[in-house]
Amino acid sequence: MKLATATMFVVIASAAMTTGAFASPEKGLEIAIEADSRDKGFGDSTAQITMILMDKYGQSTERAIRNRTFEGDNEGDKSLVIFDSPGDVRGTAFLSHTKKADSDDQWLYLPALKRVKRIASSNKAGPFMGSEFSYEDIASQEVEKYTYNYLRDEELNGLDCFVVEYDPVDRKSGYKRQIVWMDKAEYRVHK
């Protein structure tokens, strides 16, 4: 009888550990708020980016991109992405206005059609310009758009990290959840 009771305790304890019984929403939110506060104050930024797309045969295509982001105080950030090459995407532009609580506003300018296409909130999970990124990935990440669970501490590539689960509040999100490894020193996402 004692052996059966001890076995049952081990089974229940193991199940509790694997289901996130020790997850902490409070600590997860604290970590997310601290990461967000460390990202504030940049004002604006510019970047030259090279996007490399690989097909299933291993062939690659490079796209030259300019990015400009303006930090918003209470409304969220605004960013403009312009494709400079290759020729088939030259002049294509993507404008995003991130909102803290509501759905983001996003538009795509297609020079071949001379049209601006609004990206519907129900289409945020769609692929961004033929890449594995979604329109949702391109937008700024706002604390208010997720609930959080601190899962554990774990080392990743020699860095001491928090492991935090992000659960999107928006039911139209392309993600059910995201598990993020964030270093403890700088609060940067590494995985």
Predicted regions mapped to residue ranges:
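Bacterial N-terminal signal peptides
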Residues: A6-A16
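N-terminal mature ectodomain segment of secretory-pathway/periplasmic proteins
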Residues: S24-A112, N149
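Gly/Pro-enriched, hydrophobic low-complexity segments
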Residues: I33, L95-H97, D105-Y109, R115-I119, ...
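Hydrophobic alpha-helical segments, especially N-terminal targeting/anchoring helices
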Residues: M54, L110, E154, M182-D183
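Short acidic/glycine-enriched loop/turn segments that link adjacent beta-strands
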Residues: E75, N157-L159
